[in-house]
Protein backbone atom coordinates (compact mmCIF):
# COMPACT_ATOMS: atom_id res chain seq x y z
CA UNK A 1 0.00 0.00 0.00
CA UNK A 2 1.24 3.47 -0.93
CA UNK A 3 1.04 5.93 1.98
CA UNK A 4 2.38 8.97 0.10
CA UNK A 5 -0.84 10.96 0.33
CA UNK A 6 -1.41 10.04 3.97
CA UNK A 7 2.13 11.06 4.89
CA UNK A 8 1.74 14.37 3.07
CA UNK A 9 -1.54 15.01 4.91
CA UNK A 10 0.20 14.30 8.22
CA UNK A 11 2.89 16.89 7.45
CA UNK A 12 0.25 19.44 6.45
CA UNK A 13 -1.48 18.85 9.78
CA UNK A 14 1.78 19.33 11.70
CA UNK A 15 2.32 22.65 9.94
CA UNK A 16 -1.22 23.79 10.75
CA UNK A 17 -0.64 22.87 14.40
CA UNK A 18 2.44 25.07 14.57
CA UNK A 19 5.44 22.86 13.83
CA UNK A 20 7.85 25.12 11.95
CA UNK A 21 11.30 23.49 12.11
CA UNK A 22 11.81 22.35 8.53
CA UNK A 23 14.34 19.71 9.60
CA UNK A 24 11.71 18.07 11.80
CA UNK A 25 9.09 18.24 9.07
CA UNK A 26 11.49 16.79 6.50
CA UNK A 27 12.58 13.99 8.84
CA UNK A 28 9.00 12.99 9.56
CA UNK A 29 8.10 13.19 5.87
CA UNK A 30 10.94 10.78 5.10
CA UNK A 31 10.27 8.31 7.94
CA UNK A 32 7.78 5.51 7.14
CA UNK A 33 5.64 5.51 10.30
CA UNK A 34 3.50 2.68 8.93
CA UNK A 35 6.33 0.16 9.32
CA UNK A 36 6.71 1.06 13.01
CA UNK A 37 3.13 0.09 13.90
CA UNK A 38 1.49 -3.36 13.93
CA UNK A 39 0.07 -4.51 10.60
CA UNK A 40 -3.53 -4.23 11.79
CA UNK A 41 -2.96 -0.55 12.69
CA UNK A 42 -1.33 0.51 9.43
CA UNK A 43 -4.45 2.11 8.01
CA UNK A 44 -4.21 4.57 10.92
CA UNK A 45 -0.43 5.03 10.76
CA UNK A 46 -0.51 8.66 9.60
CA UNK A 47 -3.50 9.81 11.63
CA UNK A 48 -2.65 12.12 14.51
CA UNK A 49 -3.14 9.61 17.28
CA UNK A 50 -1.14 7.31 19.52
CA UNK A 51 -1.36 3.64 18.54
CA UNK A 52 -0.72 0.46 20.55
CA UNK A 53 2.49 -1.40 19.75
CA UNK A 54 2.24 -4.22 22.32
CA UNK A 55 3.64 -4.73 25.82
CA UNK A 56 1.16 -2.12 27.05
CA UNK A 57 3.03 0.59 25.14
CA UNK A 58 2.12 3.04 22.38
CA UNK A 59 3.74 4.91 19.54
CA UNK A 60 3.15 8.60 20.28
CA UNK A 61 0.92 10.70 18.05
CA UNK A 62 2.87 12.40 15.24
CA UNK A 63 2.20 15.90 16.56
CA UNK A 64 3.68 15.04 19.96
CA UNK A 65 6.76 13.46 18.38
CA UNK A 66 7.26 16.57 16.25
CA UNK A 67 6.66 18.94 19.16
CA UNK A 68 9.13 17.19 21.46
CA UNK A 69 11.84 16.88 18.82
CA UNK A 70 11.39 20.50 17.77
CA UNK A 71 11.68 21.54 21.42
CA UNK A 72 15.13 19.92 21.61
CA UNK A 73 16.46 22.55 19.16
CA UNK A 74 18.81 20.03 17.58
CA UNK A 75 22.01 20.56 15.61
CA UNK A 76 23.41 18.18 12.97
CA UNK A 77 26.41 17.29 15.17
CA UNK A 78 24.34 16.48 18.28
CA UNK A 79 24.46 13.22 20.18
CA UNK A 80 21.00 12.36 21.48
CA UNK A 81 19.73 9.99 24.17
CA UNK A 82 16.13 8.80 23.92
CA UNK A 83 14.42 7.12 26.86
CA UNK A 84 11.66 4.75 25.75
CA UNK A 85 12.52 3.34 22.35
CA UNK A 86 9.15 1.67 21.84
CA UNK A 87 8.91 0.63 18.20
CA UNK A 88 11.88 2.82 17.23
CA UNK A 89 9.93 5.49 15.36
CA UNK A 90 11.13 8.58 17.26
CA UNK A 91 14.71 7.32 17.11
CA UNK A 92 14.35 6.96 13.34
CA UNK A 93 13.11 10.54 13.04
CA UNK A 94 15.91 11.81 15.28
CA UNK A 95 18.52 9.93 13.27
CA UNK A 96 17.69 11.99 10.18
CA UNK A 97 18.49 15.22 12.06
CA UNK A 98 21.49 14.46 14.29
CA UNK A 99 24.81 12.60 14.19
CA UNK A 100 24.10 9.83 16.72
CA UNK A 101 21.10 8.46 18.62
CA UNK A 102 21.22 6.14 21.62
CA UNK A 103 17.81 4.85 22.68
CA UNK A 104 16.93 2.76 25.75
CA UNK A 105 14.01 0.36 26.12
CA UNK A 106 13.34 -1.59 29.32
CA UNK A 107 11.22 -4.24 27.58
CA UNK A 108 13.49 -6.74 25.87
CA UNK A 109 10.97 -7.81 23.22
CA UNK A 110 10.31 -4.23 22.13
CA UNK A 111 14.01 -3.41 22.15
CA UNK A 112 14.85 -6.42 20.00
CA UNK A 113 12.07 -5.63 17.54
CA UNK A 114 13.06 -1.95 17.30
CA UNK A 115 16.74 -2.78 16.84
CA UNK A 116 16.01 -5.29 14.08
CA UNK A 117 13.67 -2.92 12.24
CA UNK A 118 16.03 0.05 12.46
CA UNK A 119 18.90 -2.11 11.23
CA UNK A 120 16.84 -3.43 8.31
CA UNK A 121 15.83 0.11 7.31
CA UNK A 122 19.43 1.31 7.39
CA UNK A 123 19.36 3.60 10.41
CA UNK A 124 23.03 2.96 11.13
CA UNK A 125 23.49 5.90 13.50
CA UNK A 126 20.97 4.50 16.02
CA UNK A 127 21.96 2.12 18.83
CA UNK A 128 19.24 0.41 20.88
CA UNK A 129 20.05 -0.50 24.49
CA UNK A 130 18.04 -2.67 26.89
CA UNK A 131 17.89 -1.36 30.44
CA UNK A 132 16.53 1.08 32.98
CA UNK A 133 16.11 4.32 31.07
CA UNK A 134 16.03 6.38 34.26
CA UNK A 135 19.71 5.50 34.73
CA UNK A 136 20.62 6.93 31.34
CA UNK A 137 23.83 5.75 29.71
CA UNK A 138 26.72 7.12 31.79
CA UNK A 139 29.31 5.32 29.66
CA UNK A 140 28.19 7.34 26.61
CA UNK A 141 27.49 10.67 28.32
CA UNK A 142 27.35 13.60 28.04
CA UNK A 143 24.51 14.09 25.58
CA UNK A 144 23.61 17.27 23.72
CA UNK A 145 19.93 16.40 24.00
CA UNK A 146 17.81 13.91 25.93
CA UNK A 147 14.26 12.99 24.92
CA UNK A 148 12.11 11.10 27.41
CA UNK A 149 9.14 9.44 25.73
CA UNK A 150 7.38 8.35 28.94
CA UNK A 151 6.06 10.19 31.99
CA UNK A 152 7.98 10.52 35.24
CA UNK A 153 6.93 11.94 38.63
CA UNK A 154 10.14 14.03 38.50
CA UNK A 155 13.24 14.54 36.36
CA UNK A 156 15.54 11.57 37.07
CA UNK A 157 18.83 12.77 38.57
CA UNK A 158 21.04 10.61 36.31
CA UNK A 159 19.53 12.23 33.22
CA UNK A 160 20.20 15.72 34.55
CA UNK A 161 23.78 14.71 35.28
CA UNK A 162 24.32 13.29 31.78
CA UNK A 163 23.26 16.48 30.00
CA UNK A 164 26.10 18.33 28.29
CA UNK A 165 26.79 22.02 28.78
CA UNK A 166 24.14 23.88 26.74
CA UNK A 167 22.25 20.57 26.52
CA UNK A 168 18.45 20.29 26.37
CA UNK A 169 16.20 17.71 28.03
CA UNK A 170 12.50 17.29 27.18
CA UNK A 171 10.39 15.17 29.52
CA UNK A 172 6.74 14.74 30.62
CA UNK A 173 6.54 15.21 34.40
CA UNK A 174 3.53 14.76 36.68
CA UNK A 175 1.07 12.22 38.01
CA UNK A 176 -0.30 9.02 36.56
CA UNK A 177 -3.14 10.57 34.57
CA UNK A 178 -1.71 13.88 33.32
CA UNK A 179 1.62 15.61 33.06
CA UNK A 180 3.36 18.80 31.98
CA UNK A 181 5.90 18.64 29.17
CA UNK A 182 9.07 20.32 30.43
CA UNK A 183 12.22 21.50 28.69
CA UNK A 184 15.37 21.79 30.77
CA UNK A 185 18.39 23.65 29.44
CA UNK A 186 21.83 23.45 31.01
CA UNK A 187 24.06 26.51 31.18
CA UNK A 188 27.20 25.58 33.08
CA UNK A 189 26.02 24.21 36.42
CA UNK A 190 22.56 25.76 36.10
CA UNK A 191 19.44 24.05 34.77
CA UNK A 192 16.61 26.30 33.59
CA UNK A 193 13.15 24.73 33.30
CA UNK A 194 10.37 25.76 30.90
CA UNK A 195 6.79 24.47 30.88
CA UNK A 196 5.67 23.65 27.34
CA UNK A 197 2.18 22.12 27.45
CA UNK A 198 -0.14 19.60 29.10
CA UNK A 199 0.39 16.00 27.97
CA UNK A 200 -0.49 12.41 28.82
CA UNK A 201 2.08 9.63 28.42
CA UNK A 202 2.56 6.03 29.50
CA UNK A 203 4.60 5.78 32.74
CA UNK A 204 8.38 5.76 32.88
CA UNK A 205 9.31 2.69 34.92
CA UNK A 206 12.68 2.54 36.66
CA UNK A 207 14.74 3.15 39.74
CA UNK A 208 14.51 6.94 39.43
CA UNK A 209 10.84 7.23 38.38
CA UNK A 210 7.74 5.07 38.82
CA UNK A 211 8.54 1.61 40.13
CA UNK A 212 6.91 -1.76 39.55
CA UNK A 213 5.22 -1.27 42.94
CA UNK A 214 3.24 1.59 41.38
CA UNK A 215 2.62 -0.38 38.18
CA UNK A 216 2.92 -4.08 39.12
CA UNK A 217 1.33 -5.23 35.88
CA UNK A 218 4.20 -3.71 33.92
UniProtKB/Swiss-Prot annotation:
GO molecular function terms attached to this record: protein-L-isoaspartate (D-aspartate) O-methyltransferase activity
EC class of the enzyme, as a word: transferase
Domain of life of the source: Bacteria
Active site: 60
Location(s), subcellular: Cytoplasm
DNA repair among keywords: no
InterPro entries (UniProt xref): PCMT, SAM-dependent_MTases_sf
Family per similarity comment: Belongs to the methyltransferase superfamily. L-isoaspartyl/D-aspartyl protein methyltransferase family.
Catalytic reaction annotation: [protein]-L-isoaspartate + S-adenosyl-L-methionine = [protein]-L-isoaspartate alpha-methyl ester + S-adenosyl-L-homocysteine
Pfam family, any one: PCMT
PROSITE patterns, A to Z: PCMT
GO CC aspect terms: cytoplasm
SUPFAM superfamilies: S-adenosyl-L-methionine-dependent methyltransferases
Function: Catalyzes the methyl esterification of L-isoaspartyl residues in peptides and proteins that result from spontaneous decomposition of normal L-aspartyl and L-asparaginyl residues. It plays a role in the repair and/or degradation of damaged proteins.
Keywords (A to Z) from UniProt: Cytoplasm, Methyltransferase, S-adenosyl-L-methionine, Transferase
GO biological process terms on file: methylation; protein modification process; protein repair
Protein name (record): Protein-L-isoaspartate O-methyltransferase
EC number: 2.1.1.77
Amino acid sequence: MDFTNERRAMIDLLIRRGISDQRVLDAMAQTPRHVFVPAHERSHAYSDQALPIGEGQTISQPYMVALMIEALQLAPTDRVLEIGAGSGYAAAVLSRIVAKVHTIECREALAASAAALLRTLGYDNVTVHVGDGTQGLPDYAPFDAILVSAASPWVPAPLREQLASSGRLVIPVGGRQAQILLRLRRTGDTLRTERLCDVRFVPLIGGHAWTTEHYPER
